[in-house]
Amino acid sequence: MQRYPTKQIKIRDVAIGGDAPIPVQSMTFSKTKDVKGTLAQIQRLYFAGCDIVRCAVLDKEDAKALREIVAKSPLPVVADIHFNHIYAVMVSEYVDAIRINPGNIGSKERIKAVVDACKQRKIPIRIGVNSGSLEKQFEERYGRSVEAMVASAMYNINLLEDFDFTDIKISLKSSDVERTMQAYRTLRPKVPYPFHLGVTEAGTTFHATIKSAIALGGLLLEGIGDTMRVSITGELEEEIKVAKAILKDSGRQREGLNIISCPTCGRLQSDLMKAIKIVEEKTKHIKEPLNVSVMGCVVNAIGEAKGADVAIAFGKESGLIMRRGEVVARLKESELVDRFLAEIDDEIKSRE
């Protein structure tokens, strides 16, 4: 499905919305005042393929530290502000964007002060609605519901528009998958601004992957979403790995290998698991979009190979290498993986 048309904004040099690719975001978990530690985490995210990073601003020391962090960061930096609007005004001088939580940022006057500062610097604001920290007026009226989340978003969007500010990005996050999806779906036709997708407090890698694949993948397939973060209680790199997989498998990003492999059964007569692990490790650096197939027997291997750029069909102590369904080699099992990797390299070179 085509993406919903949205206004395009920029965070440093990264475009969000319109027809721009969907950037992947993450957040450091170091104390932001620890400049060295925070920059080390940003560097890890950069090499993992992250596009935008967010840093928490808990106090004045964090706010001051961001100046040096932004200057040295290879990624655009978003300041994550809760409770104290003064920090937002302070860091607006040097960060690339501001995220405010409408549930705790305070009065109209405080929001206007943030808007005025961002307007002067020409940096965007994310209205980051979270079902766990809604404004009292909306939670009392609607409970912690989709209606409350959407009402909060609309109120704050209208407020920023009243202040003549439209460099806006919106998120509506909940730890509940269905509530998250319904909130984004409900708001999407009402506003022209880009959406930042995410399931908040999604848990450890396994649970966060499942929740995010359902919610974010489902929304992307419906054409909703302009940037995203997969929130994981775990290693930073896992967030980027999962996010990129969701983008690829939802058809929103064509980058790297799409590896098709069978779940194995009693017909298996080779060490397919070992082969898959080697292939994944040896090809993780590849950016070229390729379909490759690694199958344990010939039952489905020939059919899958027709749709693959390069394929293996394992047999008993031997197997086939195929290019677009055509057999190019019959080899011993011990030779298959090396030849398969060589054929992948050759396929990439043929496209240069």
From Swiss-Prot:
PANTHER family reported for this sequence: 4-HYDROXY-3-METHYLBUT-2-EN-1-YL DIPHOSPHATE SYNTHASE, 4-HYDROXY-3-METHYLBUT-2-EN-1-YL DIPHOSPHATE SYNTHASE (FERREDOXIN), CHLOROPLASTIC
Free-text remark on how the cofactor is bound: Binds 1 [4Fe-4S] cluster.
Metabolic or biological pathway, per its Swiss-Prot or TrEMBL entry: Isoprenoid biosynthesis; isopentenyl diphosphate biosynthesis via DXP pathway; isopentenyl diphosphate from 1-deoxy-D-xylulose 5-phosphate: step 5/6
Gene name of this polypeptide: ispG
One of the protein's GO biological processes: terpenoid biosynthetic process
Protein name: 4-hydroxy-3-methylbut-2-en-1-yl diphosphate synthase (flavodoxin)
Catalytic activities: (2E)-4-hydroxy-3-methylbut-2-enyl diphosphate + oxidized [flavodoxin] + H2O + 2 H(+) = 2-C-methyl-D-erythritol 2,4-cyclic diphosphate + reduced [flavodoxin]
Source domain of life: Bacteria
Gene Ontology MF: a single term: 4-hydroxy-3-methylbut-2-enyl-diphosphate synthase activity (flavodoxin)
Cofactor(s) the protein requires to work: [4Fe-4S] cluster
Family: Belongs to the IspG family.
Keyword Iron-sulfur among UniProt keywords: yes
Keywords from the named record: 4Fe-4S, Iron, Iron-sulfur, Isoprene biosynthesis, Metal-binding, Oxidoreductase
Binding site for [4Fe-4S] cluster: C262, C265, C297, E304
Enzyme Commission designation: 1.17.7.3
Record function comment: Converts 2C-methyl-D-erythritol 2,4-cyclodiphosphate (ME-2,4cPP) into 1-hydroxy-2-methyl-2-(E)-butenyl 4-diphosphate.
